[in-house]
Amino acid sequence: ELQEIGYRVESDFEPGSRNTAFETASRKFEFIPEESKDAAKNVMVKAEGEEPAYPLVLIPYDSPRLASGFIGDPPFMIKTVPDTVLKENDLLVEVHPKTAQSLGISEGKPAVLKTPKGEARVRVHLFEGIMPGLVAMPTGLGHQAYDGYLAGKGINFNDLIGPVEDEVSGLDAAWGIRAKLSRV
């Protein structure tokens, strides 16, 4: 097909030498160039927010039953989401029982989840599989559009988080944000 539609070749083009293709010390491709390794060793990307005001860290998690992108879930998929994730229109966040106990919060009870970017009313699901000090929120909920099966169900994780820049690469490293969980 390429022969039929044609292509262009510049007659004076000369490919570079393999020995000069990569301007690194090893002259090979390097995921992290030697010059950057020291800078990357001890850099931990901090979650946005100050610890005294926001003692917990909110992290997202994906569920195979929820689409986490811009597209909405089909209505039959919403019906398969367990009550430990979405109960009626209320989103449940996962909290370790020790963390919940220290906050005076129990299973299924309403709470306010606050971050430097916003706040939301949630319910609490106690889960020993999450590390104490973390709050996990499913992605893929909180749509404001589509239809009656999707709109208004849960909370959009993106409303509670913002970009965090990795100092070494300059890329967004928004893996979580500091948070506070309070009883209602």
Regions found by a protein language model. Name each.
Residues 1-83:
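Long, low-complexity segments enriched in small/aliphatic residues
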Residues 1-8, 68-184:
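Long, contiguous, secondary-structure-rich segments that constitute the structural scaffold
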